Regions:
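C-terminal or mid-to-C-terminal helical accessory/interaction module adjacent to the motor/catalytic core
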Residues: 141, 183-269
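Basic, low-complexity terminal or inter-domain segments flanking catalytic cores
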Residues: 1-3, 165, 221, 258, ...
Length: 837
C-alpha cells in the first residue's frame, strides 16, 4: 500500500481523483476520511491532515535543581533541558503564585512568571489526536509513504510533523516528498513521477517562526492582559508582527491628527462646443489667497466666449502588468472590494478546485517550464476570454512581462483551468476573472495612450483641461482594472472659439495623508519585511478581531493607539518594524541552511527579554493608558439618571452587547442592542435627545438608531398579517399580529391567543413589513413581504416550515452542480395560495 498524506482533506480527495486509474473510493479510518484507489497495479490511499497536527506550547513548570540547574517539566513529569539566565531568581521561593517551593508555575498568568516564560522550553503536543491515530494506523500497513503537503514553510513543517508521527508507527517504510504548484492532472502526475526528499531546512525555518511567534505572542499578550483594567473584558492581544503593523496604522493616524489644514481656492470654468459640455480648471490649480482668485473671477465675469489657445497631443506607452504574486493579488483584489483575508480564502478554494495555481508565492517571473500556450487554450473555453486568447495565440512566440522577484518554488499565480460565472460563486468568479485577465495581460502588448492638453483663454485668463484616449488598447482591452476616468473632450483646434458658460470659485482645504487601505497596508508590510506572504492577511484580520482597528480605510481605535503609545514609550523595539524584519531575515537564512534554528530562536528570546525588562517596571502606567482608551472606545454618552458615562459592554453570560452605565452597581441603567457591528455616534437623536448608534448587520447597510427603546423613532404600529392556523385547526378564530418588543426592539408575529395556542414566528429585524392575503402552502403560516435596500422579499416566517428544508436541498444540489460544472434545473420559488380569511 502506498500512503499519500496531504495538508487538507479536500486535497486528499482531489489527488485521489486525479491519480487513480480506478474511481477513488471514500472510506474512513476511525473518524478520518481517506480515499482508496489503484494505480500501476498497486493499492493507494490518501489521507488529509487538518493543517498542523502538532502544536508548540510551553512546558507547564520550571524546576530548579542544585546539581542540574533549571529543567522544564512536561504534563507527564518528563524533564526537558532549560536554558534560564543566571540573573533570574532561583528557589527556594515562598509558595505564592506563580512560584512553588522548587520552581515556577508557567501556566499562571502572573507578572513574575513572564521573565521565565521568555526562556521556557517548548514541547510539541498533539493538536489533532484523531487524525494522528488514523495516520499511524495507515502508516503501519504502508510499504511507502509520500508527503504531499503544500510546498512552502508551513507545508514543509506540517510534512515534518507527519514524518515524526509515521516514523513512530513504521520506521522502515521509505518516505518521499511530492511538490506541486497546481491541482491539475498534469501537475499532480508530474509531481508524483518526480519525487524528492523533505526539505529539512525549510521545515526548521517554519518551526522557528512557530516558536518565535508563540514566545513573543504569549509573553506580550500576557503582559497586556495582566495590566488590563478589570471589568472591560477580553485578553489584550500583542505579537511579534501584529504590534509593529498596528504601529504603522497608528503612526499614519498621528500624521493625520497633527496635520493642520490650509485654505485654498480653485476656479472651474464651464464650456460648450457643439453639443458637448465640458469643464476646465484655471491654470493656477490652487490659489492660496482668495484675493487672487477674486481678481480672476472679475476678469472672466460677463465673458461669453473662450479661445482655444493651444492643443498639445502626446503619445505614451503604458507597459502591461507583471504576473501576480500573493501581495500584488491581494492589493488588486482589495481595490475591487475583496479584503485580503477573503481574497486568500477564495484563492485557496479556487486552487483546491483546480482553477488557479498555488496562491501563496513571492515569484513574479513565469518559469520556462510553464506552458503558456496550453493555459491560453484552456481558458479560451470561456466565451468572454476567447477573442483575446485566440489573438494572443496568433502571435506565435509569447513574451511575458517579468517582475523583480524570481524564485524557484512556485510560478506566479495564474489560471490552470477554464471557469465561467455559472461554475463559481460570484465572489469566486470575481477573483478568478481578475487572475485570468491578469495572466492574459502579462502576455499582451503595451497600450498606447494619447494625452491631450487643451489651453483655453477667457479674457486672457488661462483654463487648462487634460484628457487621455486609448489610441492602441493593447493589454487594456483584456485588463481594464485601475483605469482612471478622464474628462471627455470635444474635438478642438487651435484658434477655435467655444462658448464660455461661466466660472465657479470654490473654497477647499488641504487634506491629511490618507489612511491605509487593507491592500496598501499589505504592500507596506511587504516593503518593511513584516510577516510573510502567507501571514500578512491574517495579521490584519486579527487586528480587526481584537478591536485595535476599525473600518476600511483602516482607522485605529483608542485602544489600538493606547497599546502602541504604551509599548512604544517603554519598549520601542517591540513596535518597530526593524527588529521583526531582521528576525524574518534570520528565519529565511535557516531555510537557506546558513543559520541554525536554535541560534535564531535564542536570539529572539534575548531581544524580547530586554524589552520585557523595560516594560514590567512601568506596568501601572501601561494599565492607566489602557483603562482610559477602553473607556473612550466604549463611550456612548452621558447617563440620563446619574450623569456618568454610558458604555458599550459585553455580557459575561451571553456574550451579547448592551449599553450600561459606568456607575454600576449604584446605577442600574441599561439599554439592549440589536445584533451587528455597533458604533457610537456623536450626533444626538433629534426626537428625544438621547445618544445614537450606527448598527451594521450582516450583509446589510448601516442604520442609525436611537438607544432609547421608548423613543418614537423605534416604535412600529402593530400589523395584522393573517389568521392563526393552530387556532383554525381547533375551530377558533384568532389573528396573527406582527409587533415590536418595546424593550428589546425585536420583531415577531404572535397569535392574539398566544397564552393558549403558543403560535409565534420570528421576523427579520430590518425592513418595512407588509401583510399579504396569502398563506404558505407547506405550513399555513401567513406570507409577508419585507422590503429592504435590496428590494421586496416575500417569505414564510415559520423557521420549521417543511418548505425551507426543500429549498435548502435544492440550493445544495445547485451548489454541487456548479462546482462540477453541470447545469441544474431552474429553481422553483416557494409557492403560496390565497388565504381563506
Amino acid at each position: 500500500v502506498k500512503l499519500v498524506v496531504t495538508e487538507k482533506n479536500i486535497a486528499a480527495q482531489k489527488i485521489a481523483e486525479l491519480l487513480g486509474v480506478t474511481k477513488a473510493k471514500a472510506d474512513k479510518v476511525y473518524s478520518t476520511p481517506v480515499y482508496r484507489f489503484e494505480r500501476d497495479g498497486e493499492e493507494w490511499v490518501t489521507i488529509g491532515m487538518r493543517g498542523h497536527i502538532l502544536e508548540p506550547n510551553f512546558v507547564p513548570q520550571l524546576i530548579y535543581k542544585k546539581r542540574g540547574g533549571w529543567v522544564g517539566v512536561d504534563a507527564d513529569g518528563v524533564a526537558i533541558p532549560a536554558s534560564i539566565p543566571d540573573d533570574l531568581p532561583k528557589p527556594p521561593f515562598k509558595k505564592k503564585k506563580p512560584f512553588i517551593p522548587e520552581g515556577v508555575e508557567l501556566g499562571a498568568w502572573k507578572m513574575d512568571a513572564l521573565p521565565y516564560l521568555v526562556y521556557a522550553p517548548i514541547e510539541k503536543l498533539p493538536k489533532e489526536k484523531d487524525i494522528i491515530r488514523s495516520l499511524k494506523n495507515l502508516a503501519k500497513k504502508a510499504d511507502s509513504i509520500i508527503i504531499a503537503t503544500d510546498f512552502d514553510r508551513e507545508g514543509e513543517l506540517i510534512g515534518s510533523d507527519v514524518l515524526t508521527c509515521v516514523k513512530e508507527a513504521n520506521d522502515t517504510a521509505p518516505i518521499a516528498r511530492a511538490r506541486y504548484s497546481a491541482i491539475t492532472k498534469e501537475e499532480i502526475t508530474r509531481a508524483f513521477t518526480n519525487l524528492v526528499d523533505l526539505d529539512t531546512n525549510l521545515a526548521q525555518a517554519g518551526e522557528s517562526r512557530q516558536d518565535i511567534d508563540l514566545i513573543w505572542g504569549a509573553v506580550l499578550t500576557r503582559f497586556l492582559t495582566i495590566v488590563k483594567f478589570a471589568g472591560y473584558g477580553n485578553v489584550r492581544s500583542s505579537g511579534r508582527v501584529q504590534t509593529p503593523t498596528l504601529a504603522l496604522i497608528v503612526a499614519r493616524e498621528r500624521e493625520r491628527m497633527a496635520f493642520v489644514p490650509e485654505d485654498y481656492w480653485v476656479i472651474k470654468g464651464d464650456f460648450n462646443h457643439g453639443e458637448m459640455d465640458f469643464s476646465a480648471p484655471h491654470a493656477t490649480a490652487r490659489f492660496k489667497k482668495e484675493e487672487l482668485a477674486d481678481v480672476v473671477m472679475e476678469h472672466v465675469a460677463g465673458a461669453q466666449e473662450a479661445t482655444v489657445a493651444s492643443v498639445e497631443k502626446k503619445k505614451r506607452k503604458v507597459q502591461p502588468p507583471v504576473p501576480f504574486n500573493t501581495t500584488s493579488l491581494m492589493a488588486a483584489a482589495s481595490a475591487e472590494g475583496l479584503s485580503p483575508a477573503r481574497t486568500m480564502r477564495l484563492a485557496e478554494s479556487l486552487y483546491m478546485d483546480g482553477y488557479i495555481s498555488y496562491p501563496r508565492v513571492d515569484n513574479t517571473v513565469y518559469p520556462s517550464s510553464l506552458d503558456l500556450v496550453d493555459i491560453l487554450k484552456r481558458i479560451s473555453g470561456n466565451p468572454a476570454y476567447r477573442p483575446y486568447a485566440e489573438e494572443l495565440l496568433k502571435k506565435g512566440k509569447l513574451t511575458a512581462t517579468r517582475g523583480k522577484t524570481e524564485t524557484t518554488d512556485h510560478p506566479p499565480i495564474h489560471p490552470t483551468n477554464m471557469a465561467t460565472p455559472e461554475q463559481l460563486a460570484p465572489a469566486e468568479y470575481k477573483l478568478y476573472n481578475l487572475i485570468a485577465r491578469r495572466f492574459m495581460a502579462t502576455l499582451s502588448d503595451a497600450a498606447v495612450v494619447e494625452g491631450t492638453k487643451v489651453t483655453l483663454e477667457v479674457n486672457q485668463e488661462p483654463f487648462v483641461v487634460k484628457g487621455d484616449v486609448l489610441a492602441v488598447p493593447g493589454f487594456r482591452a483584456i485588463y481594464p482594472y485601475g483605469l482612471k476616468k478622464n474628462e471627455q473632450l470635444p474635438a478642438l483646434s487651435e484658434g477655435e472659439t467655444v462658448t464660455f458658460k461661466g466660472a465657479i470659485k470654490t473654497k477647499k482645504q488641504t487634506e491629511p495623508p490618507a489612511r491605509y487601505s487593507q491592500g496598501k497596508l499589505i504592500q507596506e508590510m511587504e516593503k518593511l519585511g513584516l510577516g510573510t506572504k502567507s501571514t500578512r492577511h491574517s495579521i490584519i484580520e486579527r487586528l480587526y478581531t481584537v478591536k485595535y482597528v476599525q473600518n476600511d480605510p483602516i482607522e485605529p481605535s483608542q485602544l489600538g493607539i493606547a497599546v502602541i503609545d504604551a509599548l512604544g514609550k517603554f519598549a520601542p523595539h517591540v513596535t518597530s518594524p526593524d527588529m521583526t524584519a531582521n528576525l524574518e531575515e534570520e528565519m529565511t537564512s535557516i531555510a537557506a541552511g546558513s543559520s541554525a534554528k536554535e541560534e535564531v530562536v535564542t536570539h529572539s528570546r534575548d531581544l524580547l527579554a530586554k524589552e520585557l525588562a523595560n516594560l514590567i517596571p512601568h506596568s501601572e502606567e501601561v494599565k492607566e493608558a489602557l483603562v482610559d482608551a477602553v473607556a473612550a472606545d466604549a463611550y456612548v454618552g452621558p447617563c440620563p439618571k446619574c450623569g456618568k458615562d454610558l458604555q458599550l459592554r459585553t455580557s459575561q453570560k451571553t456574550r451579547s452587547m448592551f449599553i450600561g452605565c459606568a456607575g454600576w452597581p449604584d446605577c442600574d441603567v441599561t439599554y439592549p442592542l440589536p445584533k451587528g457591528k455597533i458604533e457610537a455616534l456623536q450626533e444626538k437623536c433629534s426626537t428625544c435627545g438621547m445618544p445614537q448608534i450606527k448598527v451594521t448587520a450582516f450583509r446589510s447597510k448601516p442604520r442609525v438608531l436611537c438607544i432609547d427603546p421608548e423613543c418614537e423613532t423605534n416604535k412600529e404600529p402593530d400589523l395584522v398579517v393573517g389568521m392563526c392556523p393552530t387556532c383554525a385547526e381547533q375551530g377558533k378564530k384568532a389573528q396573527l399580529i406582527a409587533r415590536k418588543n418595546p424593550r428589546t426592539l425585536k420583531r415577531f408575529i404572535r397569535c392574539e391567543n398566544y397564552d393558549e395556542c403558543k403560535t409565534g414566528y420570528p421576523l427579520p429585524q430590518y425592513g418595512a413589513l407588509t401583510a399579504t392575503e396569502e398563506v404558505c402552502e407547506h405550513c399555513g403560516a401567513p406570507m409577508v413581504i419585507v422590503t429592504t435596500n435590496r428590494g421586496p422579499w416575500k417569505l414564510c416566517p415559520n423557521f420549521s416550515c417543511p418548505g425551507k428544508a426543500e429549498e435548502a436541498k435544492k440550493k445544495e444540489a445547485k451548489a454541487a452542480a456548479k462546482k462540477s460544472g453541470k447545469k441544474t434545473p431552474t429553481k422553483k420559488k416557494t409557492t403560496s395560495k390565497k388565504s381563506a380569511s
